[in-house]
Structures are given as structure tokens and as C-alpha cells.
């Protein structure tokens, strides 16, 4: 018999792993809702026409396509089958696909429901996405995204709120972080003043690698793309820019004085910094001119978050976009959003041992089952304990005490209650702390037992 297996790049999660993951998801959800965001969900499957062409050629290749129901081959003529063209086959045989991210489905949702939505629309979404990528360490075919967006508003106060959300989420999770901040308009201004305005993408792709490969290799990459030494020298002051946030912005204001676009980006960053300084931010906030993520669709602020105490790439990212819904015919709908990388956050918390033990406990109290009669007498008490929020189990059948204690140990249940004939007659519960081995006799009263455990 063939051993059961799961597809590569997919994962099972144990109860302990799910407790940890839900701790992250619940924290993100609670903070989003504190700031007035409302949750939506979109279907696992979208029409391929919704997904195709939105992620570039590489993204289209990584879409999981779903075969149509029924006898698919009956729709093909002999010549089409003989052609053995997988792309044409998929185009005709597959009308649906698994969502690649949460952004395009969100844009589709806004366009379809625009007459019902109250703008500005503050939405969050925590759902899995799928990519037909080559599985490797830290890269999966199924993973969760935790997105938050404000759409239908040009106000930079939305960026300020999203920065506060990021700071509060990581404060609650116990992760020290640095939020890197830049603006697409500043990058455009830099390209203008070095006389390479039409080569913005080449410039930003190279300088975005600065922290990974260093300045010399960034310059080498620029040379391989055809940049002359004069242009590289003009870029150097921007790439090497040091100082605190205000000093960087002052230098940029001088260096980009001839670029209206660049000055607009500086104005926007200055506004964000001014507002953020009025609140107590728990994360560091650093202007980083080399940050150039998502330039294919971000039009204003760009941000990325790094953990300070763990070796890990970006654990959150986001930015402002001006025309997300334009791909579905609704023009001019500005928005800004962020996405928490749940899997990377999980890995950071494991590295730093940040998951609180008390949050990861399943059952808090196990009642030993001595007999059917004893079990019957315990049911009302167990019901009251559950009503008071104590996660309580009754071992399902009478068994040897050793077996029931072993079950409690294996399940990391911190307390066990023993109520035999003597305890039942006295109206008491023998409560055992499984970590210390200490035992105490308590009245068989739900409030008293809860107080002793919690």
C-alpha cells in the first residue's frame, strides 16, 4: 500500500503549531480592528480572467489553474490535442485558478461591490494564497497573507495609521523591529537629476540590493545595465546617504531641488514623520533611500519591516498605489496597504522563543475518570467550569490512573482533578499541579477552581 503524502510545498500543522499561528493571526486581527478595519474574505478560486495578466509573465506561470469539470478533452479537436501546447490547453480547459495573492481579489471585490461599500474602505483579510513555485526553505506553495488596506482616500494620515498598526502588532508579539520608509516619487526624482529618468526600474532594482550585496556590486550591476561612470558617481551620494531621518530629508531637498516630483515625495515623507512623532512608536522608523520594493504598482510611500534580533528578510511590507482597481475598469481609486508575512513572523518568534506558554495551552484542566458513576456526577461541575472560560476535559472512559496521567503529560495539561468516592462524598476536588506535583483539596465549586488555576 502506498504511504499517504501531501504535495511538495504544502504543510500540515500540529495542534501546538496551530496555537502559535493563531496567536499571530489573533494579534494582527485585534490590532486591525482597533483601528477600525473590517474583515472580508474572497473565494479560494477566482476566474482565470481575473488573475491572468496581473502579475506579469512570471506570475502567470505560477498560477495554479483548475481543470474544468466534465469531459474536458471532448472540447478539443484532434489537431489541438496533437499540437501538445500546454498553454493553449490550459487556456481552453481551465476557467478558474487559485488566488495568487489577496490584492487582485481585493481589487475585484471593490469593483464588484462599489455601490455597497462605504468609502474610504478600511479592510483586512487573513487567508491562504497559492503559488506554483519551486518549494525550498522558507518558500511554500501555500501560505497565509495578512493584508490591511485603506482604499478611496488620498490622505497620508492612512500611512500614519498603518505605521502605528505595524508598531502595535510587533509590540504585542514582542519583536523589536525597524520600519524602513521611502517614497516612489523620491526615487523618480533621483532618476531625473542623474539624467536617467527613463531608467528608473534599472536604477531601483540595483540599489534595492544594497543591503544584500554591498555598494561595489550594486555599481557593477549598474555597469552591466549600461550606466556610465558619470551616472554612477551622481547616484553615489544618494545610495550612501547617512544621518538621521531629518538630515536625510534636508540633504534630499537640496539634491532634488530641480525635481518637482522628488520634492513632492520629500513633502509626503516629512508629513508622515511629523505625524508619527506625535505618537509613541514602539518600532524604529528609518528613512531608507535604497528601499524600492513593488515599484510596478506603488506610487507614493513604500515601507518594509525588518526584525532587529533575528536573521530574516522582510516580515511586513506595503505602500501607496493610485490605480489598483483600474485593472477592472474603475479608474482613480487611490489606496494604501500593508501585508504581514505570517510565516516569517512565526520563524522569528521561534528563533527568539517569544511564544507565551500560557497562550499556547490547550486544555487547562483534566478530570480523571474513575467510574461511570463518578463521571456522571462531574458533568454539572465541568459544564460550569467551561461556562466560566476554563478549558476543561473529562477523560472519556475509566482507565488506570497512570494512563490518564500520561495522557495529561503528553497533552501538556497543567492541572489534573481527581474526584473519587471520598472526594465526592466530601464535596471536594483534589487538584494536582502537573508541573510542580503539588496537590490541594478544594471545594467542588467552579469559581474556586478557576481562581486556583487562573
From Swiss-Prot:
PROSITE patterns: AA_TRNA_LIGASE_II
Entry keyword set: Aminoacyl-tRNA synthetase, ATP-binding, Cytoplasm, Ligase, Nucleotide-binding, Protein biosynthesis
Gene Ontology molecular function, alphabetical: ATP binding; histidine-tRNA ligase activity
Top-level lineage group: Bacteria
Subcellular location(s) per record: Cytoplasm
Biological process according to GO: histidyl-tRNA aminoacylation
EC nos: 6.1.1.21
Major subcellular site: cytoplasm
Alphabetical list of PANTHER family matching this protein: HISTIDINE--TRNA LIGASE (PTHR11476:SF7), HISTIDYL-TRNA SYNTHETASE (PTHR11476)
The family this protein is said to belong to: Belongs to the class-II aminoacyl-tRNA synthetase family.
Subunit details: Homodimer.
Name of the protein: Histidine--tRNA ligase
Organism in which the protein naturally occurs: Porphyromonas gingivalis (strain ATCC BAA-308 / W83)
